[in-house]
Amino acid sequence: LDLMKRSGCLGLFIGFESVQKATQNEVMKIKNLRIDFYEAMRRFHGEGFGILGSFVFGFDYENKDVFEQTLEFIMRSRMDCVELRILTPFPGTRLYERLLSEGRLFVRDWWLRGYPPDTLLFQPKGMTADELISGFSRLNRQTYSFGAMIKRFFGMSPWKRTLFGCQVYAGINLSTRKRYFKGLRNPQPFAGASN
């Protein structure tokens, strides 16, 4: 951490993937299984680093409780910026091949059809498609409400108290908020919803 700080590093992108341990095991985030996320966030913030945490939803071992658990972690850890995504089975990956062999893909050639990011392209295992979509949408609304962003801002790293830090934090959060809320106002049906 000291070397990162001396290098001028202001923040880190951390792919948490999931707050649920079974999912971390599924995606082979073995190192995460031995790390207390709250302690890691406390140390990073204590050293002045901002954190952009990334979470992905739709893994087989997740259930609908993952959304509330993720929100609790985001707010309690006072994560600076958040990226929330729905799992995407890219062609040529083991995930794509497995979902295809299990008959869980809604559309085989989804990438040729222009589906936007965060479109649910497969039948989830640990929850219904509707539960995943509604939980994901609700989590986005809660995470990017002005109240939640302000609450996280005032408990954050010292770098945000600089003009540059404020601009970075506000820019990332407001642009992400705009992207999510634009998508939620004009929702795209998931691949299995039509024809």
Predicted regions and their residues:
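Short linear elements at protein peripheries
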Residues: 169-195
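A conserved cytosolic signaling coiled-coil/coupling helix that links sensory/transmembrane modules
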Residues: 92, 167-169
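A structural motif corresponding to the C-terminal lobe/cap of the Radical SAM core domain
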Residues: 1-161, 188-192
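Intrinsically disordered, low-complexity N-terminal regions enriched in serine/proline/glycine
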Residues: 114, 143, 168, 179-180
